[in-house]
Amino acid sequence: MSLDALQQRLGYRFSKPELLQQALTHRSHSAMHNERLEFLGDSILNCAVADMLYGMFGKLDEGDLSRVRANLVKQQALYEIAQMLQLPDALRLGEGELKSGGFRRPSILADALEAIFGAVFLDGGFDAARTLIRKLYIPILEQVDPRTLGKDAKTLLQEYLQGHKIALPLYTVVATHGAAHNQQFEVECSIPKLEIRVSGSGASRRAAEQSAAKLALDEAHRLVPQLVKRSRAERTGKTRKQATPPDPQLSLRLKE
């Protein structure tokens, strides 16, 4: 992808395009890499997201706001935004990193996105960087349920199952589709005790697992209450059976 095409996707045009080029450059490619820009962008991202959360979630306390922010700026969240921007097609990697599939690596893509935020800050100032971050994050924030503190589907599924003493789900890659630079993964999520078996897809194994986990969580929310109700009924039946006193007339008849 050309720098011009990426700038169109970002909705921001650099006065110094070399900053964007540096933000896309991995240390395996050249000495003028993106690690310092990533350091800068990380701080700007945290500040901008904190500002948005402060304005959107007035009822959350400091601890909950911090937890929501942590979930929104972690590697997986950044990776998914990078995929949406098609950053894998714009990265500058060394030959070895390119051959090993570095353009798909979540850490490399997340770092490049943070470096872009740093580059925009140096090029246009904090307001420009904040505007870009808001543009990318508002659609995500609109879907955040403050009750779950922005946790991803895999985390929510794990916590829900642990809360009901059900074994954790199993994730299995069942298929991959497409060329090496544009693969789609299909992952199956299974929960044997609930007889749940669902599949999700995504541009990475992690994204596909998240997709499958969301479907499994929906199914678990539907099935677990039924399982709990059935289990309680069985326990109640056993208790009543044990509490029923023996019939003395029946005992006499059996002796005769």
Swiss-Prot record:
Residue ranges constituting the RNase III domain according to the UniProt record: 3-125
Gene Ontology terms: cellular component: cytoplasm
Protein location: Cytoplasm
Lineage: Bacteria, Pseudomonadati, Pseudomonadota, Betaproteobacteria, Burkholderiales
Entry keyword set: Cytoplasm, Endonuclease, Hydrolase, Magnesium, Metal-binding, mRNA processing, Nuclease, RNA-binding, rRNA processing, rRNA-binding, tRNA processing
Biological process annotations from GO: mRNA processing; regulation of gene expression; rRNA processing; tRNA processing
EC number of this enzyme: 3.1.26.3
Positions of Mg(2+) binding: 38, 111, 114
CDD domains linked: DSRM_RNAse_III_family, RIBOc
NCBIfam families: RNaseIII (TIGR02191)
Segments for region (Disordered): 226-256
EC top class named in words: hydrolase
Function: Digests double-stranded RNA. Involved in the processing of primary rRNA transcript to yield the immediate precursors to the large and small rRNAs (23S and 16S). Processes some mRNAs, and tRNAs when they are encoded in the rRNA operon. Processes pre-crRNA and tracrRNA of type II CRISPR loci if present in the organism.
Coiled coil: none
GO molecular function: double-stranded RNA binding; metal ion binding; ribonuclease III activity; rRNA binding
Active-site residues per Swiss-Prot or TrEMBL entry: 42, 114
Reactions this protein catalyses: Endonucleolytic cleavage to 5'-phosphomonoester
Species of the source: Ralstonia pickettii (strain 12J)
A Pfam family that the UniProt record links to this protein: Ribonucleas_3_3
Keyword Metal-binding recorded: yes
Stretches assigned to the DRBM domain: 152-222
Protein name, per record: Ribonuclease 3
Domain of life: Bacteria
